[in-house]
A protein has these predicted regions:
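Mid-domain beta-loop-alpha active-site segment that forms a flexible
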Residues: 175-190, 209-217, 261, 265
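A glycine-rich dinucleotide-binding beta-alpha-beta segment and adjacent secondary-structure elements
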Residues: 319-373
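Aromatic-enriched alpha-helical interface/lid elements that frame and gate functional surfaces
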Residues: 243-320, 324
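A short glycine-threonine-serine/GTX helix/turn-capping micro-motif
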Residues: 170-180, 202-204, 234-244, 255-256, ...
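N-terminal helix-loop segment corresponding to the beta1-alpha1 unit
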Residues: 1-201, 348, 378, 384-416
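Substrate-binding/catalytic subdomain of NAD(P)-dependent oxidoreductase enzymes
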Residues: 193-234
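Short, well-structured beta-strand/strand-turn elements
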Residues: 38-41, 318-332, 393-398
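Short Gly/Pro-enriched turn/cap motifs at secondary-structure boundaries
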Residues: 68, 234-239, 245-246, 353-356, ...
């Protein structure tokens, strides 16, 4: 059963989502999860390019637009050509209506569209203007296009730090850096809203993919800043530490052991696997010896883990209360009971008797309800409705269509 609108934390908060792809729109999605009203503004014709990203390999194949549903639930869509001079009055009224504006246009594009903070602030001095860039607002690359994989993963060094010495850098799952950056922008917006409560004034907040990539890799980036010596790429066959590594089981699965408290965990592990010979081996007698002989220990553990299936190893490691993780496959992830017990995945409110599920935003407030995820909008689905709410009458809307500021009909994604 859904809660009344007034029960949500951000009921009455109005958000304009001018952003594209994932990071900016996902920040607006988190606001919508707590009751904010979000209007997604898209160019007529193709709309947000993220509408079609799911069709691009190596994304999993499905006719239904799963990525769009995830990032744009609980939003209304307004198709608006910001390049059209007739759109200026619509933009002015939208900004006057809004509490928050989210964009990820590069600075030069914002200037061209008259969508900078300085352009829109006079329309609404209480506006929270939130922007994301690839490489930051300043510097020689401020206008450089940036994506999750290029600015968050590659530029920050994450790709280098996580790759195996025998392999080139792996292309990660799309959106990992975007979703991390979205939470940063959400935090910035909420901080600015708190400031507005105290001062009555709006402000501009920003973050970038490269900043969040640097924050994600900060433990080792800080080491570099202090002049630490790096051992080079991690070689799985000869790592710095064989007890923080992944091992293949007899049924071709992978289990990651993470014995951070090595001197405490090692004797427990050796006892659990009934390998007293390893305990007595001088090569593995203490942490210093194990690190010096990591390649030999990897060879021993490779043979050991390859001797039994995954289920045997999880039972043994659980019984010994040792820290480990199973490298899950998609079929397991979507059935993981922890995801359902903690409402990490939640049903989509689409009126179906057999609801499908989506990933919820990654935090909750006790005794504070979240909005049930609704179906993401078609391009321009709510254009007329929103224009009427802004005070445009039928004749004015017809004129806007005649001049091309808004499309004549909503677009169906399937027709594009």
């Amino acid at each position: 059963m859904s809660s009344p609108a007034s029960a949500y934390l951000f009921s009455g908060l109005k958000v304009l989502d001018f952003a594209s792809f994932i990071a900016g729109p996902a920040a607006a999605t988190v606001l919508s999860d707590f009751g904010a009203e979000v209007v997604k503004v898209e160019p007529p014709g193709a709309g947000d390019p993220h509408r079609y990203l799911y069709r691009t390999p190596p994304n999993p194949a499905l006719k239904e637009n799963y990525t769009w549903q995830l990032t744009n639930r609980n939003k209304r869509s307004l198709a608006l050509d910001l390049k059209n001079p007739k759109s200026s009055e619509i933009l002015k009224r939208l900004v006057g209506w809004a509490d928050v504006l989210v964009t990820n246009f590069p600075p030069r594009v914002r200037r061209r569209l008259k969508l900078t903070y300085e352009d829109v602030f006079p329309f609404n001095p209480r506006l929270i203007y939130a922007d994301i860039t690839g490489y930051g607002e300043l510097g020689p690359e401020a206008d450089k296009p940036g994506f999750d994989i290029t600015a968050f993963w590659a530029r920050s060094g994450l790709m280098q730090f996580t790759r195996d010495a025998s392999s080139p850098p792996a292309v990660p799952v799309p959106g990992i850096g975007d979703h991390a950056t979205a939470i940063s922008l959400y935090a910035a917006i909420v901080t600015a809203l708190y400031r507005r409560e105290r001062t009555g004034e709006g402000c501009c907040v920003s973050t970038s993919l490269i900043a969040n990539g640097a924050w994600a890799t900060a433990a080792w980036l800080q080491a570099a800043l202090f002049g630490a010596k790096f051992s080079g790429e991690i070689d799985r066959k000869n790592p710095p530490n064989a007890l923080t590594a992944s091992y293949r089981t007899s049924d071709n699965r992978w289990v990651l052991i993470l014995f951070v408290e090595e001197d405490k965990n090692w004797p427990v592990f050796v006892k659990a696997i009934e390998r007293a010979d390893l305990q007595g081996d001088p090569r593995f007698a203490d942490s210093k010896s194990r690190h010096a002989n990591a390649a030999a220990l990897v060879a021993e553990l490779d043979r050991l883990f390859a001797s039994q299936p995954l289920a045997n190893w999880t039972a043994l490691l659980d019984a010994a209360s040792l820290p480990y993780g199973v490298v899950q496959i998609p079929e397991e992830i979507v059935k993981d009971p922890q995801l359902f017990a903690n409402r990490i995945v939640v049903p989509i409110n689409d009126g179906s008797a057999n609801p499908r599920y989506t990933v919820d935003s990654p935090f909750m407030l006790k005794e504070q309800p979240k909005v049930a995820p609704g179906v993401a909008p078609e391009l321009g689905q709510h254009t007329d409705q929103i224009l009427k709410e802004l005070g445009f009458d039928a004749d004015q809307i017809d004129d806007l269509r005649a001049f091309g500021a808004v499309p004549h009909v909503p677009h169906s994604e399937a027709s594009l």
